[in-house]
């Protein structure tokens, strides 16, 4: 297996250090008061700039308030590129640079940041629903079944560092860019359809579900309870703030690669 990283040994076996139990009173989601966390307590999100639209800013603040023990980091486009440049081989950075849709770049980056640091990636259009806390997801890795039940919805990913599903996804994106591969839908080059090559939708770790009612009402369910919801107005804010065409439009035009 070729090395993926410049400064990371894939063959190094790390012991998972279980952190001390954390007491969280008044958690609506569960009656548990103690959690044996193995997932690093990081929350990662990305937007093309650090200057967020007002409703998006409020959603981010809600995440921070609900999860004070977590390290939160917002990456802009430059931060995303610098992380890949720092930790990964030149062909991964080249793939990032040659992807045109911002969403495709964000797909590659989210796999990279979780592979390096571990933690939780969440699309910036989501906010906690009814006080949900991410500590509920930190006892194991988690993936989300997409609404069509045929893909892995990558708007939320919970991962240990060194995750091999993410490693394989990164390598496949590099190959797709090099071959200018489009696949049979716009979610194939970097997103939910790509991930199903490396983890089955029937895998026990795929234990959350994406539910789509309309553009302002997308939910993520855990144990049949809604825990995350898109904030109202996110679609309007994104349309005003976007600096590139939607990835679906670019895919239809066969214009997702440089």
Residue ranges of model-derived segments:
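Glycosyltransferase-associated regions of secretory-pathway enzymes
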Residues: 1-106, 122-258
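Small-residue hinge/turn detector
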Residues: 107-119
């Amino acid at each position: 297996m070729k090395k993926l990283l410049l400064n990371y040994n894939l063959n190094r076996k790390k012991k998972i250090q279980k952190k001390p139990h954390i007491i969280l009173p008044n958690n609506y989601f569960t009656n548990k008061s103690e959690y044996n966390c193995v997932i690093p307590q990081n929350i990662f999100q990305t937007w093309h700039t650090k200057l967020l639209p007002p409703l998006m800013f409020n959603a981010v603040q809600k995440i921070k308030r609900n999860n004070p023990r977590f390290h939160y980091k917002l990456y802009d486009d430059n931060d995303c590129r610098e992380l890949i440049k720092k930790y990964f081989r030149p062909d991964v950075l080249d793939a990032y640079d040659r992807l045109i849709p911002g969403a495709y770049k964000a797909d590659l980056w989210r796999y990279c940041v979780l592979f390096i640091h571990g933690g939780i990636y969440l699309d910036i259009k989501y906010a906690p629903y009814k006080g949900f806390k991410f500590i509920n997801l930190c006892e194991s890795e988690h993936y989300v079944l997409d609404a069509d039940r045929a893909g892995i919805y990558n708007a939320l990913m919970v991962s240990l560092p060194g995750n091999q599903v993410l490693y394989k996804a990164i390598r496949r994106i590099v190959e797709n860019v090099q071959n200018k591969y489009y696949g049979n839908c716009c979610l194939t080059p970097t997103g939910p359809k790509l991930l199903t090559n490396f983890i089955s939708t029937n895998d026990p770790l795929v234990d959350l579900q994406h539910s789509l009612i309309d553009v302002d009402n997308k939910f993520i369910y855990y144990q049949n309870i809604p825990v995350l919801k898109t904030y109202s107005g996110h679609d309007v804010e994104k349309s005003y703030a976007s600096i590139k065409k939607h990835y679906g439009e670019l895919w239809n035009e066969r214009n997702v690669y440089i």
